Amino acid sequence: MAHNHNHDHNHEHQHEVITLVDENGNETLFEILLTIDGREEFGKNYVLLVPAGAEEDEQGEIEIQAYSFTENADGTEGDLQPIPEDSDAEWDMIEEVFNSFLDEE
């Protein structure tokens, strides 16, 4: 999912940072761009992430990763799961919420 990042950069963003560990044990920092409560419709929550310190490409876009997540009871860790590519209803909901988020920025 690419994001055309056209909004005012003269304000500070206070994003939480999380660490993702891949299957090889490599750690990568990501900023939490947006969380979405999808429990009522899909029974899970979603998170949109951008690599920490990511820069826009030539087209002014930044790659955004979307996951469903289940938070541990203590709120410090949780499990991220890829969203199935064929789950059109989930992707439509995420895109709708994300576009509303961009409109508010």
UniProtKB/Swiss-Prot annotation:
Pfam families for the chain: DUF1292
Superkingdom: Bacteria
Q: Which residues cross the membrane?
A: none
Family of this protein: Belongs to the UPF0473 family.
Q: What is this protein called?
A: UPF0473 protein SAG2089
Q: Which organism is it from?
A: Streptococcus agalactiae serotype V (strain ATCC BAA-611 / 2603 V/R)
Q: Lineage, please?
A: Bacteria, Bacillati, Bacillota, Bacilli, Lactobacillales
